[in-house]
Amino acid sequence: MSFLNQLKSQASALQSEKEAQNSRFDSNTQITESTAKSVALYVTDLAKQLNVIAPAGPKLTLDGKTPWPAMKMLDFRSDARKKTLRDREVYDYIGMGWSLLPVFGQPVGGSVSANFPPDLQRIEERLSAGGVKHERISVRHPEKNTLQAVRFDYTTQARGSLTITPDHDAGKLNFRLANVQGFGVVNLSYPVDRVQTALLDELAKMLIGQPSTFV
């Protein structure tokens, strides 16, 4: 076989592989988009129902020692955005956000301190995850001026969220849950054939603190 024929053979194999890959991508995109549409409708309806119910929120603490008051979930809002993928309009993400506020009365002020890096990092991550308004204050020795601790003065008001991002090429949905079972973020993925009403019901149960097999 001449060298040119070898190149032709190599090009033909690559072309066949590319066509098979494109066919697989198109199939995955179609299935994923259909699933994403169903999920968007579910999330929109879920937000409406939860706005009426205003379920109890998770137990919250920034340092693991200082509990927040009993919280409730309210002001649920759903959203969905689209993008263009291979000349086709598809879902970019599906989301729902909500407020976490005290069950009784208005948000109140609180304070936590840390003087070890791991504790400091944990508190900062939780403040960031919850979108908690706060002020960071360095506590120093009155005479030596050495740093003794870092204090965070905060208000007991936070945000929770659910973001679902379709991966059309891989045929899966990526779920990001923020502040659902306390401060923190959970990320996980499910293939689209697993994302049925039963799974979404388990997700809804998890969001409002009921026993769930979603994670």
Q: How should each PLM-predicted stretch be described?
A:
Residues M1-V215:
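A composition-biased, non-transmembrane "mature-region" signal
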